[in-house]
Amino acid sequence: WGFQGAVASQFHEIAFAVPLLAWASAAFVEGRWVAVMAWSAPLVLVKEDLGLTVMMIGLVLAWRGRENEKSFTYPLFFAVFGLLAFFVTVKLLLPAFNASGTWAYSLDGSSNRGDVTLIERALWPAQKYGVIAMVILGAGIIGMASPWFWVIMPTIAWRFLGSVDYYWDWKHWHYNAILIPILLGALLDVHRRWSSQEDSSISRGWGWVTSTQRPLVATIALAL
């Protein structure tokens, strides 16, 4: 669904982000943390908000590798890199190229939305719930159990806090395309962990429990 909207829309720079996120997602599922960071780092050159996505990837890797000092520390530095790249881009680079000296797409909450709270901006109008439903289904529901699922949060946050109606839609435009490889990566990550649990459960006579879950995962993924 995310790719269909992007294909029907105009060309956008997110076309460069999709394969990078796909390779990063595959590396995460395989447990190759250095490869995840290598594929994710160029995202800061694609679009201004993706520095926040890089930051979240670093935090997710730190969480997954928290039992090892190096696997915990290096991803934290990577998260800081993503955050710094975001601020340098939106506070220095983009204003320098703008005649008015500002970041034209800042989330100022304008467009006649009145005096509303941050929570109201994030959760209203109800059109946003369609996006929430689709990302949950896009991860096969069970993908929400993967820390990789949290990589979508910066994108969801700026879209929901933004004042442009197109940001809140799941059917059209290109804004959902970068979510797809992340959601599939989250789904595959949970499936891989289930498979590992099944291998250990077979020896204890409980393999039938996890084996019954595979058809459900496959059905949800194929339907989407």
Where are these regions (language model features)?
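Aromatic- and kink-enriched transmembrane "portal" helix at the membrane-lumen/periplasm boundary
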Residues: 1-15, 45-50, 160
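Specific aromatic-rich, kink-prone transmembrane helix
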Residues: 14-40, 58, 62-64, 182
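Transmembrane helices and adjacent periplasmic/lumenal helix-loop junctions
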Residues: 33-61, 145-149
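Perimembrane helix-loop-helix junctions
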Residues: 53-82
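Signature aromatic-anchored transmembrane alpha helix within multi-pass, membrane-resident enzymes
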Residues: 79-83, 195-224
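Extracytoplasmic catalytic-loop and juxtamembrane helix elements of membrane-embedded
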Residues: 90-120, 157-176
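Hydrophobic, aromatic-rich transmembrane alpha-helices
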Residues: 128-156
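Hydrophobic/aromatic-rich transmembrane helices and adjacent perimembrane loops
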Residues: 150-205
